[in-house]
C-alpha cells in the first residue's frame, strides 16, 4: 500500500521532506570495476569486447561478429510483427515532425559600433546510442534517441546493444533502421561505453553518448565524460498525477500503474483535493494489479515508493509539484492550462483528462527521454539541442578595433595579462 500524506497534518512538512529524499536505487559500488573494464578496452580493443560479451552475455562474437550486418537487419524485418513495425513508423514520423521544429537558427547582426556578432549551430559529427538489452530493451527508446540526432544533422549515429545469448530484439533493429542509425554493434555494458568513447579496431570513437543503462553503464558514462559528452544519468521512471474528484478513478489508477510496471524502483504519485477520490484510486490500483502481467513489479513499486498526497485545494498542490520536479506530470484538472502557466519544474507535462502519459512514451511526438530524480529542477528532456553545438562569431574592422581597444587594454592590464593587451595595441601602433 502506498503512503498517504495529508497537507493538513501537523507533521506534513517533515514527512514530505523525508519523502522527497527517499532513495529509490540501491547504489552499487562499481566504479573500480568499471575503471578496469575501460582500461582493458582501451588497451586490448576488440579482444576485450569479445571476452566481456562471452562472459556477461554468453554470446560468441568471434562467430557472430561484433557488427550487425544488413542481412541481420533484413532478418529482423521478417521476424518482427508487421503491426508493430507500422506503429514504429507512425511514431517515427510524429517524433521527426515535432523535433524538426526544435532546429535552432544561426544569427549575425551588427551593433551600434559596427562590430559584427553572432553564432552558428553545427551538428555533432558522431553520436553513440546505448540501448539496454533483455527486459529493458525498448524499440521506442531507439526512436526517441536516434530521430532527434538525425534531425539535428548528425552524420554518424552508432548504436550498441547487448545480445544475450546472441539475440537482439528484432524490433530494436527495425527501429534503428527506420530512424537512420548508421552502425549497430552487438555489445553492451561498460565495455560498450568504453568502445564508443575510445574506439577499437571495429568501432570508431564518437563525440557524445546518449541512452540509459544499468549501474555499470551509468558509471562508465560518468568516467568517460570529458573525453566525450553524455546526455544524462537516468534514474527510475516516475509520474506525478494531479487530479480532482471529477476524474474516473480507474483511468488515474491505470496511469499510476503505467509507471509502476517499469521497475520496482519506479515511483507513482497522486495529488488530489478529494480524499474520497484518493481512496477510490487506491482501490482501483489494487484491482488492476491483479490483471497485469507485470503486476508483481508494479505492486512492489506502488508499495515501496507510491504516494497519495491530499491537499485542501488544487492550487495548494502547485508548490508541491515544483518541489517534486517529476519526470512526468499529468494535470487531470479543470484549469490545466492555468496550472501549467504557474508551474516551474517538470520533465514533461500532460494536459487534461484525455492525455495519458503513455501516449508521450510512444506516439505523442515529444521526447520520452526526460530528467528523473528531481533533476527537472535544472535540466531538460532530450531534444535536437543535445545533438548540436553553438559557435560564437565576432568580426571587427580597424574602426571598430579602435573603439573597443582602450577598454580591452585596460582590463588586460588590470588582470596582469600583458600579452593580451599587446595583441590589441600592436594592431593600432599603441
From Swiss-Prot:
Domain of life according to the entry: Bacteria
Cofactor(s) the record lists: Zn(2+)
Cofactor annotation comment: Binds 1 zinc ion per subunit.
GO molecular function: histidinol dehydrogenase activity; NAD binding; zinc ion binding
Gene3D superfamilies: 1.20.5.1300, Nitrogenase molybdenum iron protein domain
Catalysed transformations (reactions): L-histidinol + 2 NAD(+) + H2O = L-histidine + 2 NADH + 3 H(+)
Catalytic-site annotation from UniProt: 327 (proton acceptor), 328 (proton acceptor)
Family label: Belongs to the histidinol dehydrogenase family.
Protein name: Histidinol dehydrogenase
Organism: Mesorhizobium japonicum (strain LMG 29417 / CECT 9101 / MAFF 303099) (Mesorhizobium loti (strain MAFF 303099))
